[in-house]
Amino acid sequence: MNGVVNLVRMGYRKPPMDSTSSPRVVGTEVRRMFGAIAERYDLTNTVLSFGIHHLWKYRVARRVPQGAAPVLDLCTGTGDLLPLLEARADGVVGGDFCLPMLECGRVRGRSSAPLVQCDALNLPFADATFAAVTVAFGVRNLEDLRRGLAEIHRVMLPGGKLVILEFGQPTWAPFRAVYNWYSKVFMPWIGGCLTGNRAAYTYLPETAKSFPCGGDFEAILREVGFEATRCDGLSGGIAYIYEGCRPAAP
């Protein structure tokens, strides 16, 4: 994968090979699912969101401090957030556990950032490496949410910033009812037509519906050690941007 050699410069940590670091069947199935839809993943996201997810990701990039370096975009998928981050930061790296997603990103050539296949629960980076970490629509797919957030905390520099974009639930009841119908009926149908994998677009809305959002997720961020947390709802609560900082060194 182009640019992986740059990891040596930033610090490399070999994940421990113990019983807790081995991926379970559930994680393997999710990886295969994303691999199966990788080729048309970006197109499908644009159709299903009516293009608004591009605006959401632009807002994520704007939350990263200007000139921050280096920056990790975890669960990067095909890397569509990377060019936005490169416009603001130096030393951007994209990481994801799904190789077909990364290959799609590499072939499309959106970014010059190195792409790294990695497990979010055992990140292959040294402690205190990144000035900022972004995650767009990825944390809800982690097998162990708190462990994944703790790993992000570990690889961040003291004072570093975390920015997460994730789906939520609309706050206004009538809109929530329409959105839930759309997610349950329309998304699997369109997703199935575009990718040939209806099951994936049944699974993804279900994870969004069951994931803690708003203040509930913000509390989890504080629980694992982040401070100065905040959350902002987008498009009536369909998505949220979360922020947190690793405490600065005393």
Report the location of each language-model feature.
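Conserved beta-strand signature within the Rossmann-like core of class I S-adenosyl-L-methionine
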Residues: G160-F167
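Core SAM-dependent methyltransferase catalytic element
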Residues: V224-E227, G233-P250
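A short acidic, Gly/Pro-enriched loop at the edge of an enzyme's catalytic core
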Residues: L121-A132
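Conserved alpha-helix/loop element of class I SAM-dependent methyltransferases that forms part
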Residues: F50-A68
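A short SAM/SAH-binding and catalytic strip from SAM-dependent methyltransferases
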Residues: A131-L145
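C-terminal alpha-helical "lid/dimerization" subdomain adjacent to the S-adenosyl-L-methionine
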Residues: G168-I220, V224, R230
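Class I SAM-dependent methyltransferase SAM/SAH-binding core
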Residues: P70-N122
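A short glycine-rich, Lys/Arg-flanked "PGG" loop and its adjoining helix->strand segment in the class I
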Residues: R146-P158
